[in-house]
Amino acid sequence: VQQLQSQFPQFKINDLSPILDGMRLIKSKEEIALIRKATQIAGLAIIEAMKSTAPGVYEYQLDAVAKYIFHVNGSRGDGYASIIGGGTNAFMGHYFHKTDVLKPGDLVLMDYAPDYHYYTSDVTRIWPVNGKFDPAQKELYNYIETYRNALFKYIKPGVTSDEVLDKAAADMEAYLVGKTFAKPHYLKAVQE
């Protein structure tokens, strides 16, 4: 913006964020249908990635499977950069490298959705490389599901995202007591 202003000082530049933000808040029936279709395609892609998961498969190969499903279902491509991580990469937040091989005993996290007529969704799933959750993985999966439900409980008009996060975190404190992944050595690994 500053570069444009310096090149064209005779023009006034206005911040359209308030107008655009307002437009993003309310969706037409047609827009909602496009978002739903993007979500359905994301679901199909993740299911195919799950079916393709096995020890020895690379993270980028799951990306390719999902991208293929996007395209054969009418998508132009990615709605955003894919997050696909196995093992410790699944817990690195926004992990984009997709270069590691999946190993037995690992979990895979995929956060990915298509661009469908300029609309997307946000779908994240986690599953075991072996195809079946072991007890510790199941415990972690149940925690994630419980936390998601706690978040949804507080999402309401007028409640800020920080308030939602704070209330859900407070709900989850008691849930964490005694959980395997809440032990100090796991928490230290997450912080590192």
Segments and roles (model prediction):
Residues 1-192:
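Active-site neighborhoods and metal-handling regions in enzymes and metal-associated proteins
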